[in-house]
Each structure stands twice: as C-alpha cells, then as structure tokens.
Amino acid sequence: LKVKVKNEIVAMGVDGLQPGRRTGIEAEPELWHDVIRDPNTVVIDTRNAYEIAIGSFPGAVDPKTATFRDFPTYVKEHLEPLKGKKKIAMFCTGGIRCEKASSYLIDQGFEEVYQLSGGILGYFEKTAKQGLANKWVGDCFVFDDRVAVTKDLKPSGHEMCSVCRHPLTAKDLADPRTVMGTSCLHCYGPRSD
C-alpha cells in the first residue's frame, strides 16, 4: 500500500484559499429551489464537462472546465462582469468543490454566493426524505465503481472506459468504436507510439 500526501483534496491551484474560514450560503433544497428560480441568479455547475454531460440542473451554466484548476480563469473571464449585479449559486457532487469555489468568489469580492448544501448527492437524499420535488435532470457522476447514480442513488448503468476514463452511456457502449479495454468513442482513433 502506498499513501501519497496531497495539499488539496480537490486542487484549484489558488494559493492562500481558506474555505474553512468563509464560504457561500449553504442552501438546503427549499432555499435552493427559490434561489435557482430567481432570474437574478446565475447557476453554475462547478463540475467537469464529462460529469455535466451525464446530468445537471436545468439552466445551469457549464463553465466548460476540463479540471477544477480551470475554474479561476472561468470566473475572471465570465463572472467578473456580473459582480454586484447577480447572485451566484453553485453546486457539485458532494460539496467539496463548492466550498472552495464559493470561498474563492467571496475572496474575489462577490457578495451573494450560494452553494447547494451537501452537494448533488445530499440534495438527492434530502429531497427524497422530505418529499420535495427533485429538479435534477439526468444522472449524477460519482467517483466510485457505480460511475453514475440516479435520483434515488441507485447505479445508473453507466460504465467507465478503462483507457480514457470517460463515463459511457448505454448508447456509447453500443457504438462500434467502443471495445471495452481497448477504446471508446471518446478515445478511438490513431494513437502515437
């Protein structure tokens, strides 16, 4: 067994960021529904593109980030002009990226920043327990053998390409370019030696 010590669980690449000090407003499902329904709110999915492709909240902005390290650039290029004009609401799988992202936005001078309490998985659990409407569309990528889960937290049937690590839908699995252990439609093609 080999243990590797890392400075950050989810790397954003921003020195001095302290999400334990201050973060956005934790929004439980009822507040979350009110916030994302507000036309003065920009809803941002802080996950990576391959996760967003599986499911998201309707109307959420896909920042088109390949990794979480791309998020500060997205903020600078797209959110800075909205500072002081719009509320920002963010969500991620379990809440870790939102903690960091909301802390970063507050450090950058954004005032009204919300984050989905417990992330998407917490939202699924809480809406089911409380009998609330679940506004999510699609499935949710998870970082374990299930690959993705449905709103009731059951495995969705997605598979993971063992070559490029891209999640695959049933349609992707039926594609002739997908040969498990060799390639999928996302990584199929000529390779360099």
Pin down the residues of each PLM region.
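Structural scaffold elements adjacent to functional motifs in cytosolic proteins
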Residues: 44-45
